[in-house]
Amino acid sequence: MNELALKYGCNPNQKPSRVFMNEGELPFEVLCGRPGYINLLDAFNSWQLVQELRRATGLPAAASFKHVSPAGAAVGVPMSETLKKIYFVDDIKEPLSPIATAYARARGADRMSSFGDFIALSDTCDLPTALLIKREVSDGIIAPDYTPEALEILKAKRKGTYCVIKMSTDYRPKPIERKQVFGITFEQGRNEIDLADDALFANIPTENKNFSEEAKRDLKIALITLKYTQSNSVCYVKDGQAIGIGAGQQSRIHCTRLAGQKADLWWLRQCPKVMALPFKDDIRRADRDNTIDIYMGDEYEDVLAEGAWQNFFTEKPEPLTREEKKAWLAQNQKVALGSDAFFPFGDNIERAHKSGVEFIAQAGGSVRDDHVIATCDKYGIAMAFTGVRLFHH
């Protein structure tokens, strides 16, 4: 089959819609459901991301995509009991497989953004992974294969309409890619730059030149994630997973702030006071996510006011004070930060430092590089100039 008709394009009024190959057969098979235009944009971008993470780290990888940018990306590094709890997988008694662990991390980092996501897996979707996916609100999944038990579970999701795509691992696109805008065809070479090479970290202009192996791994995860994120973009990574992605912002500092805010919320969810929130047993996962998000923010009274807290909790929690948040956030450390282009000013470093960043990889080449370097030196941050820009549109 070299063509697949779609219900509509980006919006219901954009008809007809299809995906097709000018030469050869489509490199994927729809095993269940009917994918939409945006579903497939998410699927094919996320597929590239997880395959590249797999090659760069040697670990199974997963991504959670929404509107053609990742909400989360991770590799299969074992999780702490704390992470299992905040990702709502602590009730799973059997050990999670590496690919299930990667998925739990990718989905769990920014659960608010991942609601209704499209999932990508680098490896075969097994039963533990399918059981995790079964409990989440998601639009679909792309993977190289599925075990029979996993496929049975996924085909039953959303009353049999859940989108399940099997992607060929042999497929290699041509080196030239094209797209049309306003009837005009754009053509460019594919972005096939290798981000797995340690040579990326050869140019280190900061006083601190020490990058641990874990830091290099996390910086590679950040850069590969950014390669498939709408620009401008910045990505915070810790312990083998993205913890804050700032996508599609017009200014670099707003990327850094947005991603930093997400990273802070990820860390705050691990605060004992947040983890001990006395939720009612019948609160749905999505409502729990939303309530936690509000509780950690400035509008906490929306869930703690009299007449409101009773809807979510068995007893009224105490607010998480500004001082408590500041003290907890100060404990975050060893965070890696990647940027899809150079940092023009040191304000980005100031903001990154507040979220525990100790390692940075960015293109370099700003007229204010000296100021950026000096700000890193102020905090003992190790920074590499990669010389690589990673814009994606």
Task: Give, region by region, the residue ranges found by the protein language model.
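Flexible, glycine/charged-enriched surface loops at secondary-structure junctions
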Residues: 56-64, 164-167, 231-238, 268-279, ...
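Conserved helix-loop functional segments at active or binding sites
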Residues: 52, 228, 265-269, 354, ...
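Active-site-proximal loop/turn and secondary-structure-junction residues that shape catalytic pockets
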Residues: 69, 125, 238-241, 249, ...
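Active-site loops and adjacent core secondary-structure elements that bind or stabilize anionic groups
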Residues: 1-197, 215-233
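C-terminal binding/interaction regions
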Residues: 117, 121-122, 135-165, 170-172, ...
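Glycine- and Gly-Pro-enriched alpha-helical subdomains that act as flexible
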Residues: 71-112, 243-342
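C-terminal accessory/binding modules appended to enzymatic or scaffolding proteins
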Residues: 213, 217, 221, 227, ...
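Gly-rich Lys/Arg/Thr-decorated short loops/hinges at beta-loop-alpha junctions or inter-strand turns
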Residues: 22-34, 109-115, 188-207, 286-308, ...
